[in-house]
């Protein structure tokens, strides 16, 4: 009887495995850890960033450089994939980033400010790897938390 239950559970978990969601989890683990091997495992060699920020290199090296640069500013960066929603060869991911701005971002030195912002990504998966990515980060919140842009409270106090 135990063997039958175990076999049923294993069959159910195998049926629920989704390679599109799995590659999204691997790429989220890259953002969580900064481990370049995870990005190289998740991204196609022909990876295209469809919402490429100014100054970022196209292809696999772009996210590697972005992670390295942002981790220099926020060394304790964590990224949790709070939602992964696969649909065919596409998968939507909501990432929740947290940490403390203790390093340097451009010319700005962090003072330990808490960082807490969201990002949303849409991946196109081909042959088990992310071939294309469209992403949107809440950069306004991030820059306000870093003290690079005034927040709502500081803007309100200037008008009073």
Feature locations, PLM:
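Short, low-complexity N-terminal intrinsically disordered segments enriched in polar/charged residues
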Residues: 4, 9-46, 57, 151-160
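A mature extracytoplasmic/lumenal domain signature
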Residues: 83, 97-99, 121, 137
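A short, structured loop/turn motif at beta-sheet edges
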Residues: 84-91, 124-131
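A solvent-exposed, acidic/Ser-Thr-rich amphipathic alpha-helical stretch
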Residues: 36-90
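Low-complexity, intrinsically disordered terminal/linker segments enriched in charged
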Residues: 131-160
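A short hydrophobic beta-strand element
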Residues: 89-101
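Exposed beta-sheet edge and beta->alpha loop/turn motif
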Residues: 99-127
């Amino acid at each position: 009887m135990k063997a039958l239950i175990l076999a049923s559970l294993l069959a159910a978990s195998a049926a629920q495995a989704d390679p599109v969601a799995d590659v999204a989890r691997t790429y989220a683990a890259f953002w969580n850890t900064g481990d370049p091997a995870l990005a190289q495992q998740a991204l196609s060699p022909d990876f295209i960033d469809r919402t490429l920020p100014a100054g970022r290199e196209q292809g696999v090296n772009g996210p590697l450089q972005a992670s390295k640069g942002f981790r220099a500013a926020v060394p304790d960066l964590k990224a949790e994939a709070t939602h992964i929603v696969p649909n065919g060869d596409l998968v939507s991911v909501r990432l929740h980033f947290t940490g403390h701005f203790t390093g340097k971002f451009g010319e700005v030195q962090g003072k330990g400010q808490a960082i807490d912002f969201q990002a949303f990504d849409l991946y196109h998966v081909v042959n088990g790897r992310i071939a294309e990515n469209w992403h949107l980060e809440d950069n306004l919140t991030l820059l306000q938390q870093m003290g690079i842009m005034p927040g709502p409270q500081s803007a309100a106090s200037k008008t009073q």
